[in-house]
Amino acid sequence: MHTLGMHVRRIREAAGITLEELARRSGLSFRGVVYIEHGKRNPSLTTLLNLARGLDIEPSRLLEVFDAARREPIESPKSDPE
């Protein structure tokens, strides 16, 4: 599954931006950026816009991934046949 955090990380690394630099540019905490990249935090719309600013990209590049992830069906646990 392609997550928003993975997308943020790819863009950040391709741009040669460190985690610390992205945090500073976007006004987020270092830990907050790490949590987003590792899928441990679901960012708000405001945070997505701040990340886009920090990455110097159009917000739509992040919003597309965010929207696609939101529409993915949630898998239910498979039960063991008895």
Predicted segments, located by residue:
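Alpha-helical DNA-recognition elements
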Residues: 35, 39, 50, 68
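Conserved amphipathic alpha-helical interaction elements at protein-protein interfaces in regulatory
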Residues: 10, 14, 54-57, 68
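Short basic helix-loop element that most often maps to the first helix and adjoining turn
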Residues: 6-25, 50, 77
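DNA major-groove recognition helix of helix-turn-helix/homeodomain DNA-binding modules
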Residues: 27, 46-61
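Conserved hydrophobic/aromatic packing and binding residues within compact polymer-binding modules
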Residues: 8, 22-23, 33-36, 62
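Recognition helix of helix-turn-helix/homeodomain-like DNA-binding domains
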Residues: 27-41
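Short, charged recognition helix plus adjacent turn
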Residues: 63-82
